Amino acid sequence: MPVAQGDLDATSNAEFYNPHGVLGGHLGIGKHADTATIRVLRPLAKSVTILTQDGEYPMTHEYNGVFVVTVPASGTKKQPTIPDYRVRTEWESGAVLIEDDPYRYMPTVGDMDTYLFGEGRHEKLWETLGAHVLRYDDPMGGADGTPGEQVVGTAFSVWAPNAHAVRVVGNFNAWDGRRHAMRELGSSGVWEIFIPGIGAGETYKFQILNANYTWEMKADPMERQHEVPPSTASIVTESTYKWNDDAWMQHRRTTNPHDGPVSIYEVHAGSWKQGLTYRDLAKQLVDYVKQEGFTHVEFMPLAQHPFSGSWGYQVTGYYAVDSRLGSPDDFRYLVDQFHQAGIGVIMDWVPAHFPKDAFALGRFDGTPLYEDPDPLRGEHPEWGTYVFNFGRREVRNFLVANALFWLEDLHVDALRVDAVSSMLYLDYSREPGHWRPNIYGGRENLEAIDFLKEATATAYKNNPGVMVIAEESTAWPGITAPTSAGGIGFGMKWNMGWMHDTLEYLHEEPINRKWHHNEITFSMVYAYSEHYVLPISHDEVVYGKGSLYGKMPGDDWQKLAGVRSMFAYQWAHPGKKLSFMGNELAQWGEWDHDASIDWDCLNWQEHRQVQTMVADLNAFYKAHPALWSQDFDPAGFQWLTSDDADHNTLSFLRIGTKGETLAVVVNFSGEAWSDYQVALPTGGKWTEVFTTDDAKYGGSDIHNGTFEAVEGEYHSRPFSAKITVPALGVVFLKPED
């Protein structure tokens, strides 16, 4: 079967878009229909022989490293087929190698896969693109001809629509891509090859002849494992993990977490305790989070990122977990252990932007492929990163499928989406004249809005029981409204206003707080405009902002009491809860990603007592639906007294869906108030059921026990009682059933 000289020349240089059309086996036509012509590329080989079940066929050097031979076809006269074969190569050194031929295999990516990807609708993209270990039964045995074995190999595929040629390189071909040129699948822009003999653990990259006719090495955008930085190659991986969280996943599918208790322990995995792996964390961190009573753990990004100083927020491998801490199956084990302990796992997800590292996504095929081609939209001036092209179907598919990958393949229970504000606004962090309006002349990023709606809607549709949470700092309306009602579709968003006002207020000396009382009450004006998470996150205890302990004024006792009252006020306020690691210890110093949190402070009893209070507060919180069952419904909250600025005190009711009621009294002054009159909705006996001032928490041990609410209108309530409210303390009161 003759081949055009131009195609042969391009194939010999591994620069042909369809090497499978030249190399491998091809049936003859006409009177030669009972034969097959086989070509292989073996530059510098001394001799090459084709081995079939019927015999050995020495090949002839045809052109520039291309060898050719014609052999008898298999099958029948009416339906001839290419015979199974292996290639024996003898090199000038005398070494002899028997191996299978990548170019005898059909495409491993189907037409439906490329169609769905082109339409932006392939919801299992990670099962198609990237590197996948496959096994085939073959009468000639394994890839090296070993009888009785399966052919084990890896299917590689990558999207590079503007590339002129793509090769796979790795240790298996001495990083010489001429042996493994890929074929382009029609007009899809997807390149593919199956390479027999390659299994899990092999490192690889794609060598791309880009739009500028320059060869570049790129890591796989769909890699599911990556070398430990600073190395930059992808790794073929095959999961052998057997999940043991069926009960958790079944419960997840049948439960709405938005209506349940959510208290989140935010963690930077590399610095909670330095030097731990995913397997180590599966013991130590799981036990600790369970001990402290949090319902969920939230990890700062654990997708692959080259620069540890980015804290994970500059991602290069969206489908790979951070290799510094272990393998993908090690990460699965960590998630599994959390689930078996009854703890949900939240992952920070960064679809807004990506770094410019040359080995990664940027200018992937020599053009702005993943990033927006408009420089006024495609680069983030503040972070020095590229912004995704949210208007391109394949890019949106890459990101939406990635969200599903974390939720489905890795069993993560929720995504916290980073930097949503930067996606919503075209002028975000840009000077006048350095941004381009949308088609209507506005500042809204219409393509990003559509992407976010698609991502949230798809996540919730495909995975009942998950949460998708926005880190969004503006007043954009409808962030947590359903897409069917014109909203963005998030389940919750961080309440940055509450966080800012609360920390500003608590930073004031108690004697000055009366002049700032509006800061601590203002959050209830808009508390139900969205579904909120109340965050005291990593961003508030870094870059000179000080630790939570350090933000509190006063002496050591007052600082610790301030931390305790801060936690209790946060846990009592409508909205789900989030606190960063170290806050529960009242650690002295602010967070440093290059060091562990201040575990040494637990050598002091006072800090152990704060840690104990947080554990007890979480247990109390989970046991009382009044504190969580109506977080997003105004019926779950009523003010008792909001205007007692002179005493730095506020009181309110939390009410559950089944009528459970708790009264909460918060004293942010430095003095205890005896005979403090509290308005109450019902008479009879009330009992103090939790106080931050208990001696076991390091408090002054003021208690109110059980007392009687007496009739008589006070602050528009029919009953009231006089209690003692501890300095810098919070008390929870419950009526007798």
Curated annotation (Swiss-Prot):
Catalytic EC class: transferase
GO molecular function, one term: cation binding
SMART domains for this protein: Aamy (SM00642)
Catalytic activity: Transfers a segment of a (1->4)-alpha-D-glucan chain to a primary hydroxy group in a similar glucan chain
GO cellular component: cytosol
Keyword Chloroplast: no
GO biological process: glycogen biosynthetic process
This protein's UniProt keywords: Carbohydrate metabolism, Glycogen biosynthesis, Glycogen metabolism, Glycosyltransferase, Transferase
EC annotation from Swiss-Prot or TrEMBL: 2.4.1.18
Residues at the catalytic site: D418, E471
Function per UniProt: Catalyzes the formation of the alpha-1,6-glucosidic linkages in glycogen by scission of a 1,4-alpha-linked oligosaccharide from growing alpha-1,4-glucan chains and the subsequent attachment of the oligosaccharide to the alpha-1,6 position.
Subunit record text: Monomer.
Record family assignment: Belongs to the glycosyl hydrolase 13 family. GlgB subfamily.
Protein name (Swiss-Prot/TrEMBL): 1,4-alpha-glucan branching enzyme GlgB
